[in-house]
A protein has these predicted regions:
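Flexible "arm" and connector segments at domain edges
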Residues: 1-55, 61-210, 214-278
């Protein structure tokens, strides 16, 4: 770790560092953190354990890079980042006894300790996060009433993930359908409203209504305990697999997709589907 920190400091050296790295700011390198996180996810999904440590390293580099920029500005350094996340994880695990290697002293677990079932952990985690948000707001001079149920959901999240989190937060305070059937009815209702605007041809209203359709579908996934982002990734993978299979079938005959009719392509698509395991 020390070598990596020293390397980043060297890359940012005003005299002997890398010209490109010296020019970067928090804002210019921020997109790389998202890109690297998705590459980590891709390696996990593919179970590419050879590439996995490499991708994790690329993601870690983004954390080190941002910390180096902050250190240069006198805000904090990497040690602060590690300390803050360690203290946060300790706070959020009151049911675990940590030794001197973590705390510098031993601590007895609180409450029911390790008797807490795993199913209770997400609820406890969210409760502790909410307490932290309130303390943070109070330290910042905000009043409790400004911390609504949706506080802390970052607008920069991918839209499907954000929709799922917003719906989940709302459900925790009772803003939810009594059963999954109600959510499904809402999906159909939003699709019908979109259909009306689509036939009118008003693109602004179409966008608004299609957004409602997507949000309601994310809510349906949340109610079914499904990850909407994972569901869509799976659908994308399936589409890619089938599309490439159609291309391969045509290539074997020396044909291209552009020369086929819609009916011919649909027939090939259905044939590919039948070859897949149910």
């Amino acid at each position: 770790m020390e070598r990596l920190l020293a390397l980043m400091a060297r890359l940012r050296d005003p005299v002997e560092g890398c010209p490109w790295d010296r020019e970067q700011t928090h804002e210019t390198i921020a997109p790389y953190a998202i890109e690297e996180a998705y590459e980590v996810l891709d390696a996990i999904q593919k179970q590419d354990w050879q590439a996995f440590p490499d991708e994790l390293g690329d993601l870690l580099l983004q954390v080190v890079y941002q910390a180096q920029l902050a250190e240069e500005q006198g805000r904090f350094d990497f040690a602060d980042v590690a300390r803050i996340v360690t203290e946060k994880m300790i706070r959020r695990h009151p049911h675990v006894t940590f030794g001197a290697d973590v705390l510098g002293h031993t601590r007895q677990a609180e409450g029911a300790a390790n008797n807490l079932p795993a199913s209770a952990m997400p609820g406890q985690w969210e409760m502790l996060k909410e307490q932290e948000r309130k303390r943070s707001a109070q330290l910042g001079g905000q009043k409790d009433q400004r911390l609504g149920a949706l506080a802390g959901v970052p607008p920069a999240l991918p839209a499907l993930i954000r929709a799922s989190k917003l719906a989940s937060r709302a459900a925790r305070v009772g803003f939810d359908w009594p059963d999954v059937g109600g959510v499904l009815e809402k999906v159909h209702e939003e699709i019908n409203e979109f259909s009306v605007e689509m036939h009118k041809g008003d693109r602004e209203k179409m966008q608004d209504e299609l957004g409602d359709v997507l949000f309601s579908i994310a809510s349906l996934a949340r109610r079914l305990k499904l990850d909407p982002e994972a569901c869509l990734r799976q659908a994308c993978d399936k589409f890619t697999r089938r599309f490439e299979a159609v291309e391969a079938c045509l290539a074997q005959e020396g044909l291209s997709m552009q020369d086929q009719s819609v009916d011919q392509l649909d027939a090939l698509w259905c044939a590919v589907k039948k070859t897949e395991k149910p």
